[in-house]
Amino acid sequence: MLRLNGLRVLLRTLAAIGALLTTASASAACADLLALSLPSTTISSATDVPAGAFTAPDGTVLDALPAFCRVVGVSRPASDSEIGFEVWIPSAGWNQNYLQVGTVVFAGNIQYRSLGFALRRGYATATTDGGHRASIGDASFARGHPQKILDWGYQALATTISNGKALVSAYTHRAPHYSYFFGASNGGRDALIAAQRFPGAFDGIIADAPSSAWVHNAFSWLWSQDAQFGSPAATISAAKLPAIQAAALAQCDAKDHTADGVVNDPRRCRFDPRVLLCSGAESDACLTAPQLQTLAAILAGPVNPRTGERIYYGFEPFAVATPGTWNQWITGNAAVPGGGHAVLANQFFANMVFDTGSAGFDHTQVNFDTDVARAERKPVAGQPLASVIDATSADLSGFRARNGKMILYIGWEDPVVPPRGAITYYESVVARQWLDNPQISRAEDALAQTQQFFRLFMVPGMGHFTGGPGTSAFGALYGPPALAIDRQHDVLAAMEAWVEQGIAPERIVAAKYANDDPAKGVVRTRPLCHYPQSAVWIGQGSAEDAQNFICVDSPRGAYLDAAPARAPLPSSAQSR
């Protein structure tokens, strides 16, 4: 018995020594990364971070992180390049995989929250600042610096893919088994760029609310800015948003057989805002004729005033009163008086298109006829601007050939990226299958071929990558946590199952928490169905429970009826 106890003590001692040696070895390995030679790259620091809370350089506090090796570096593939990046590698418990995360808006910083998300899931992870040190709402880095536009467009993504994987392999002494990418908003654009330009880099890609058609999307922002602020008489105050939302829901909410404050498929009901016209004195419950024209223009989206041709899409009216949607992006609020659309549009056009800088830019001088082509073709390092920053290529043949899988999702009430654009992009990929596969003879077959590697989820009631009255808790980068980390509830787990087990995601059960706070309980659950399916209540059982919904096929296309040939013009656009 004494011998047995002694043996146990010896084994425990050896295990403790082994753990210490392992930790010391990992520390040495992390520090050794400083000497790693990478093309056009300098490693600034490589340090071990203990488990627990971590305060990032920007002040972000990330709780409950595992111990990790934090690598900070900068790449300079060209003389005017300054691409910052970070790579975080678990010191123990690595899941053997790599997850790169995307940027936000104009980038300019490291998204530490996204790195923490990936690290907690066991991944080695990396991201970039997009090639500059401004801020997410500042595009001044681009003026007079075509190389920096190129870096922000796709070069920063490319160098971080290369450096991230090299550093992970050097630290762990093995290549990642599977590689994934997850990005939201501009990071969603990064995700599509990865599939289109670098098809061999990732096994699985998740694109959340991607601003894929960036140039045309910018015209949507400018259009709503012109409509909203073109004249004081036409401006819609935030106080009127509840009346607009109520009128839109009154017309359309019950069309999906559940009057629950969420419109499952806005394509099935075209809201007629004329019901809001004031019949007497103006109040917050109605709109004047100029305000009605403003609303109609924002909903319809930008058009060429000469030809009536659609430039891009507008925004949906069914959650406009939800905080963080229209009051932040379109009507403006105390923090952003002119609205986020004005900020993004002015920064983009002033610094990437016209090179005036913000102080010298007059948004009323942008011509919705001639300046669309001017913006698309603006020379950037020998390429048209649109080809550098847009992620609209329908050719995913390389990504498909390497057996890659991709999920794109977007909220139907997104106030930043028009959600119908996601359908148009997806349908362009479906159409491309006809070109890549001559044996396809039916539209249904082209769709089925696309669904083998690429699926689109339209999320009812969700705003820009989170928020809104819809069920937005399904494991998004910036959303509330999923009910469970499994393929039935969590989008990343669903992607892992698709890539690693061949189980394609048919539906994902999303949740809505009270005030989007998991501690306050679940308000409802709802299945997210992959396009062209949508969730339909079976007619019995609680309409707040996902088990009482089925996914059924719906018609395809951004519009189910004929889109208006000529959308109403903002008064400011009419005079140009």
Swiss-Prot record:
Transmembrane segments: none annotated. GO terms for molecular function: carboxylic ester hydrolase activity; metal ion binding. Keywords: Calcium, Disulfide bond, Hydrolase, Metal-binding, Serine esterase, Signal. It is an enzyme of class 3 (hydrolase). Residues 1-28 form the signal peptide. Belongs to the tannase family. The active site is at 185 (acyl-ester intermediate), 414 (charge relay system), 464 (charge relay system). InterPro entries: AB_hydrolase_fold, Tannase/feruloyl_esterase. This is Uncharacterized esterase XCC2094. Disulfide bonds join 252-269, 278-286, 529-551. Gene3D superfamilies: alpha/beta hydrolase. Its EC number is 3.1.1.-. It holds the Pfam family Tannase.
